[in-house]
Amino acid sequence: MPKYGYDGPFGSNLKKEHYTSEKEVRIIQLSNIGEDGWRDENTKFTTFEHLSAISRSEVKPGDVVIAKMMPAGRAILCPNSDLKYVLSSDAVKFVLPDGICNEYILNAINSSVFREQVYDNVQGVTRVRTSLQKLRTYLVPIPPIKEQLRIVSKVNELFSQLDMIEKSLQA
């Protein structure tokens, strides 16, 4: 998916001076990209004006957002809300074309098969990370849309069953 990936602004394009206490544009940070999905913590914002300067890093609801580090490769879907969102420099986004289900890609990216590709090619020692260029090269099987939807439905069904089993064991 080479032409569908975008990285966050270079660090110097989103500095502390660009942050605001006004709840204008939510900055998606590593702490928001959880193993189990979106984490609504560590809220930071920038201005609508600054968003216009880094507009290619804007994230829309349903876009796939991938952490570049700690651990590299985990992914979430941007939440559906009235807020505007922008990537931090530690994340990338995939804007998917028609015919590709964002939940299917999310599950594929969060799979051990994809993560192994990421971990085999990370760089750094203390801050292990990947890059958009590397993420663009990893393989994800993309079946026809009907099969993608069927896979997503089955995965959701199985996770629901696991949640019910977990709750019954805690009771």
Regions found by a protein language model. Give the residues of each.
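Non-catalytic DNA-recognition/assembly elements of restriction-modification systems
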Residues: 1-11, 141-171
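Short glycine-enriched, charge-decorated loop/helix-capping segments at active-site entrances
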Residues: 43-47
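Low-complexity, Lys/Gly-biased intrinsically disordered segments
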Residues: 1-36, 52-54, 123, 127
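Feature representing long, continuous alpha-helical segments
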Residues: 60, 103-107, 116, 133, ...
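A short beta-sheet element
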Residues: 29-30, 48-110
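Cytochrome P450 core scaffold surrounding the K-helix E-X-X-R motif
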Residues: 37-42
